[in-house]
């Protein structure tokens, strides 16, 4: 017996309408999430970022808030959907996807609290957190929310026309920038800038051209693209989780050393 669940058309349309409603609300959020940190970088000096916890917090707040909210919206609409999977395999995949979306949202919130703790002392700190990380961090959230369908039974990549090329280039640039930053190469910023430009072009295209009916994402290549986006998102947020843990570890080590020093002084 075939246990694949095929969603009812009106329920699929309702799921799509819910996502479109949230897209309108979050319409300019990607632009602001990229532009605002970049503006902050060009307005303030490196010493300003190093000296002000509040400035560091404000710089990263919008980008990571967009990521946290976007994944929370995807999780909410997917969880509240009337399209429930049937069969052990599809049910497992459904709950795994929801767990990933929840994890991505939590890591985004964690990053908001941990990244400002780092004082961005080195020369590349401000540009890393204000120019490089925002497009890298938000690109998978943007692609999953605008270019993919998460309805059980119809999960896949849905874009058509020139948007397919833009999305794939955005994904490749983001992958390239992540690999280069792991190698501590200065060229990672070039990929981040290109990725930002591609996202802005994609957003401009959405505003200027009427929305087209998305094809059913059942073709194997569409499912493959969706899986690649999801894998890349998992790598990005695993990387950010590692960065957050590393920052917290250094911070608490410094606190421990400071306390031990203050305790030893009275006895000297």
From Swiss-Prot:
Assigned protein family: Belongs to the UPF0328 family.
This protein's name: UPF0328 protein ECU03_0040
Native source species: Encephalitozoon cuniculi (strain GB-M1)
InterPro entries: UPF0328
A family per Pfam: DUF2463
């Amino acid at each position: 017996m075939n246990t694949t669940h095929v969603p009812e058309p009106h329920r699929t349309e309702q799921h799509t309408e819910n996502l479109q409603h949230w897209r309108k609300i979050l319409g300019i959020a990607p632009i602001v999430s990229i532009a605002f940190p970049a503006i902050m970088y060009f307005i303030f000096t490196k010493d300003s970022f190093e000296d002000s916890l509040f400035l560091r917090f404000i710089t990263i707040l919008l980008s990571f808030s967009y990521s946290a909210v976007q994944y929370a919206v995807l999780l909410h609409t997917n969880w509240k959907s009337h399209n429930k999977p049937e069969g052990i395999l599809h049910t497992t995949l459904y709950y795994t996807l929801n767990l990933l979306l929840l994890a991505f949202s939590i890591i985004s919130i964690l990053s908001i609290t941990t990244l400002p703790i780092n004082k961005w002392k080195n020369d590349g700190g401000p540009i890393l957190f204000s120019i490089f990380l925002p497009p890298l961090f938000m690109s998978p959230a943007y692609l999953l929310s605008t270019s993919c369908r998460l309805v059980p039974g119809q999960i896949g990549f849905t874009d058509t026309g020139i948007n397919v090329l833009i999305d794939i280039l955005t994904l490749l640039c983001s992958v390239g920038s992540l690999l280069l930053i792991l190698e501590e190469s200065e060229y990672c910023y070039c990929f981040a800038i290109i990725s930002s430009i591609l996202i802005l072009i994609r957003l401009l295209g959405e505003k200027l051209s009427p929305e087209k009916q998305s094809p059913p994402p059942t073709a194997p290549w569409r499912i493959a693209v969706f899986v690649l986006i999801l894998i890349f998102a998992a790598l990005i947020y695993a990387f950010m989780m590692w960065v957050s843990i590393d920052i917290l570890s250094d911070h608490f080590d410094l606190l421990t050393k400071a306390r031990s020093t203050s305790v030893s002084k009275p006895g000297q």
